[in-house]
């Protein structure tokens, strides 16, 4: 347990930041899962509506990842890695190997 006032305050601040970061990461993961699910749905039944769903979910996930990096929740390399995973999955579905 902290002994002085500044250490106690730092503990409070760290807990507040941890909770804020947790919500950011949770919503980011949710949007990524939605994008992967949209990719699966498109590969099962291709169509214009499913393709639009894939693209909008990818845009939303990219936006959330960029904001998480900007705020400092994620390291920029981690954010780039997540975006790379998403775009690879989307590319695999939308542009099948010919």
From Swiss-Prot:
UniProt keyword annotations, A-Z: Ribonucleoprotein, Ribosomal protein, RNA-binding, rRNA-binding
A GO molecular function held by the record: small ribosomal subunit rRNA binding
Pfam families (alphabetical): Ribosomal_S20p
Lineage per the UniProt record: Bacteria, Bacillati, Cyanobacteriota, Cyanophyceae, Synechococcales
GO biological-process terms attached to the record: translation
Gene Ontology cellular-component terms listed: cytosol; small ribosomal subunit
Keyword Chloroplast annotated: no
UniProt cross-references to Gene3D superfamilies, sorted A to Z: Ribosomal protein S20
Source organism (scientific name): Synechococcus sp. (strain CC9605)
UniProt family annotation: Belongs to the bacterial ribosomal protein bS20 family.
Gene: rpsT
SUPFAM superfamilies: Ribosomal protein S20 (SSF46992)
Descriptive protein name: Small ribosomal subunit protein bS20
Job of this protein: Binds directly to 16S ribosomal RNA.
